Amino acid sequence: VNKKHLVLLSLGIYSLSMPLMVQATDPIIPIAQQEQLQQDRDTQRERSLRLDEERVETVASEPALIDVPSDQNGASFYIKQIQLDGMPKELSFLNKLTHKYEQKNVTVSDITNIRNAFQRKLLDKGFVTSQVYIPEQNLNDGILQLMVIPGRVEDIRYSESSAHGPWRTALVVRPGDILNIRDIEQGLEQMKRVSSQSVTMKLLPGKAIGTSVIELSIKQEKPVYGSISIDNSGLESTGIYQGSFTTSFDQVFRANDTFTMSLSGDLSGSGSIKGTRAASLNYIIPHGKDTFSFSFSKSRYHQMIQSNPYDFTYSGKSTTIKAKWNHVWSRTQREKRAFDISISTRHNHRFVNDTEIPVQALRTTSMEFGVSNRKYIGNATLYSRLGFQWGIGAFGAQPEHTASVAMGGPTSRYHMWLADVDYRKPFVMGHRPASFTSSFHGQWVQGGKRVYSVDTINIGNRYSVYGFDGEYTLMGDSGWYLRNEVASVIPHLNTEVYLGLDVGAVYGKSAEKLVGKAIAGTAIGIRGNYASGLLFDAFISTPLYKPQGYHTKKFYSGFTVGYRF
């Protein structure tokens, strides 16, 4: 047996029995840990995008609706039926309101208030230019007639100083449609998703009665932009100092679409000793209430393992492809509900001196369905999402090792619940603007099954629980973490100081041999984002609670410095 086969055999046996006690000195764990670290970065990036999403509000002139006191001494009429004339099917929800006022005696002032109730219902549903009128009529037959005049879109045009940016893939409405302000808000949100353009909208009266013109004002900047940054978020085993370069291209097909390319890697210059490399491509395109995104990412990690009698290079590479569809199915002035469906494939391979270890190869496919809700409570924002993810045997996924699963081994055909909750509340601290942010993330595997390390939840780094250097983390099949932050702006320095307090826990079969299952930590930091393009973030953190035997620094400091262009 040659030395390569000895190494492969020992690593294969070790990989079957290793617990998810992630420690950088173990020969196999750092690669799995590096893959999890990259996923944690992606999760944090998605969380930041959710929290920073701009609220889209439109201001439209609404008719003044003043209820009139009921005239008890005036003439009254018995209303058997309310008849809505001229009402299109899009406004048929008004029919549900008629029963409330039928089979009653009403006065003239009551009739005005009934009309106001129908008008308020239209406004509540977003039909701000549709009107309800009381025509002349004889009420002796007990039928109250109300005339419904739908407000329609006469035209969609640009203002004189506006850039002629594309709107057809973003706006749901077209000329001739009944105008709903919620549909316009959805379109503006899709157009504002493109970072290089800002959009405002006005409703102007049309030439015909009951029609409106949507006037768009678009300002566009350079469609190519990006950033370069350096941080110390990596691992000792594969390179602490990491560099990244990201560039985005807007309006690739003039459809309010964006293509983004990212490259990252270690800056250690250690050659074959250790290192990381990663690249990703992402494309997103809207279509009215739908948003489609496609992503491809590839990463590779390696380290030199000092072993007796032979040193060897242990490496891993991972490829992930994901497609996602998001659909907004309900929208009000203060709430937005959506569902999303995604499918992703992931191929993981491990090598010793460029020879693959077959027992550690992993090819999986998963699907996910989620429902989300974004609610505005005053000036606060509450986002919540509940998702269900399950492994399937399609698109090149490897067969399930049923015998291994029966003996307690990991499964790729899992069923997992996912939950995310984000809350942000701006307030004033003394005389300075401030904010409180709280974010929860959790996953629960049904049936208590064990999953592969790439599907576990990982806590103990700057992206999950502050206070820990990430060299030793806790992984579990199920688990959660809660991140809390209070931040205050220093206006004259254009910076923000923040205090973080995090806690997390892991559970499941993979966590049974851990030194503990819960940790907590805190951090204080400062960050800035300047008009010149310079950005930075620096913090110092410490554990508040860790199990006995959990090895980490008493104080851990982290930084990110970069430049936007």
Language-model segment annotations:
Residues 210-212, 239-243, 275-279, 317-321, ...:
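Residues that define the transmembrane beta-barrel architecture of outer-membrane proteins
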Residues 176, 231-233, 266-269, 307-312, ...:
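Extracellular loop and loop/strand-boundary signature of outer-membrane beta-barrel proteins
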Residues 224-234, 245, 256-269, 279-281, ...:
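Transmembrane beta-strand segments that form the barrel wall of outer-membrane beta-barrel proteins
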Residues 25-234, 263-277, 439-442:
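Periplasmic polypeptide-binding modules associated with outer-membrane biogenesis and secretion
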Residues 247, 323, 526-528, 553-565:
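Outer-membrane beta-barrel "beta-signal"
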Residues 351-495, 500-503, 507-508:
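C-terminal outer-membrane beta-barrel translocator/porin domains of Gram-negative envelope proteins
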Residues 199, 224-226, 253-259, 288-294, ...:
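Repeated loop/turn-to-beta-strand initiation elements of outer-membrane beta-barrel proteins
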Residues 230-234, 251, 263-269, 287, ...:
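Transmembrane beta-strands of outer-membrane beta-barrel pores
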